[in-house]
Every structure is written in C-alpha cells, then in structure tokens.
Amino acid sequence: MLSNFLEIFLLISPVFILIILGNLLRRIGVPELSFWHVSDKLIYWVLIPALLFHHVSQITLSSTMLANYAVVILSGLFVVTTLSFIAGKLFGYTPQIWTSVMQGSARHNAFIALAIAGSLFGNKGLALGAIFMVILIPVINIVIVSTMTSTLNQEVGNNSRPSIFDVLFELIKNPFILAIATGLVISFVGAERIIIIHETTGLLGSAALPIMLLSIGANIKIREISLTITPIIIASVLKLLVFPIVVFFVAKSMNLSLFETTIAVIFAAVPTAASSYSLAKQFGAETQLMTSIITIQVALSFITIPIILAFLAT
C-alpha cells in the first residue's frame, strides 16, 4: 500500500503544488490582488463551463448509470449531513456553529476533484467528474440552504436571507449547471462532434483547472484560522474520511467499476467548498470557524486523498 500511496501522491501532487503556489503568489503580491477577483469571474463564467461542456457532451451515458451515480454519492451526503446534525446536538453547539460544521462535512470542492480526476484518468475522468458535479451541486445547495434558513436566527433582516426559491433560481442560472445540462442533451441524443465548438471549448477548458487551482490557493487565509478545535475535527473527519468510506461501500454494493468508484470517492474525499464561507456570512453563521475548516481540510487532504486512493488501488 505504501508504494501505491507514493505513486498516487506523485501523480496528484501537481494539483496541490498549484494550490500552494497560488497562496505564495498572493502573499508576495504577484500578480496584484485585483487579478484574483477578475480571474474568479473568468473561471466561473467562461473557463469551467467550457471545460464541463466539452467533456460531458462527448461521454456515453444512460439514465440508469446516472441514477446509480446519484444513489452512490447522495448516500454519502445523507450520512454526513445526519451525523453533523447529531454531533451538533451532542456537543450543544449553537446553530451558527453546527451549520458551519454541516457545510464543512457535506460540501465539496469540485475543482480539486476535477483536477485529481483529470490527473489520474485524463478526459474520461473529467467527463465522469462533471456528472457527479451536476448531481451534487443542486442537492447540496438545496439541503444546506433549507437547513440554514430553518435553523439560524440571525440579526440581519429577512430580506437579506436567501430563500429556497432564490437558491433554485440561482441554480437555474448557474453556468456550470447550464454547461453540463447542454452537454448531457448532446450526449443523450447522440449528436456528432461539432468541430468548431468542441475545439474552442477544449482550448478554453485546458486553461480552466490550472488557473482555478491557483485561485483556490490565493483565497486561503491561514492567519484567520480559529482555535475552536472540536468542530474543525468533527467536520474534517466526516468530510475527509466518513464521506468517502460510505461512498466506497455503497458503490461496491451497486457493482460500480473501479474507475466509477474511484471518481465517486474522489468527489467524496475532497475538502469542502471555498464558497461555504460566503454562505456562512450571508446567513450569520460562524465565519471564522468556516474559514478554519476550509483551510485545514485543504491541508489535510494533501495526505488523506492519496491514502484513500491507495486503499482503493489495493
């Protein structure tokens, strides 16, 4: 298993090197801070949607396969969300704290997952990874926002609190969802490869992940780490260990291939989404704790992801 760990660690290490490099670049001010804000918009509206459309539109997929993938990944989501709620009750956490723990346990950094899937499996890894994205993004957002809406008594007025309808409307406009949905339509109808469109989106998509990983690193704020240890440990154990373990056993019980299982486990094993901070701030949850969970999970995942994938390889 040690040899598998080292081999996988070396294969996916460029992903984490780019994250570290992004953080170092922000610290020394090269490029200027304004660059990261502009690049985030470029990534969100152009590069990642192009990447997702390019790969999803060329994948062969049936509705049965899609249903199986949904059962596998959503089983893990259900377990960790439930356990985070139970942990919040057992430890007597305020809604502000346990909703941050829940976000840290349930949400996923899809960009790190896509980068790892691409490093290990190339284009077919990116294509299947995009399918798991389209399953997870709507469900996670609806579950998280509905829970936070019903449990958090925050000081801001109701007008500034997103409702479920706001979330659904944002999901409909989400460029990732639109790109994947368009790609799925083309895939299901069996349309021919459109050379101009696919070559263009392929070129744009090739720039997406490197810039995205640098941006993830640039947005990590180590100085803002909280000293509230127990909630961080709970969220990290649930996200980095429990989530992928549950997904692995469900995938095995449903006879998914090793490739399909590995992609599902990668999405389960990556750290929580950086956007969790924005949602915590909107709802008046514990933002410093959320920042700490995000930062520490990224650091821990450097080790936990290769270990989990090495276990799969054996």
Name the predicted role of every residue range.
Residues M1-T314:
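Alpha-helical transmembrane segments of multi-pass small-molecule/ion transporters
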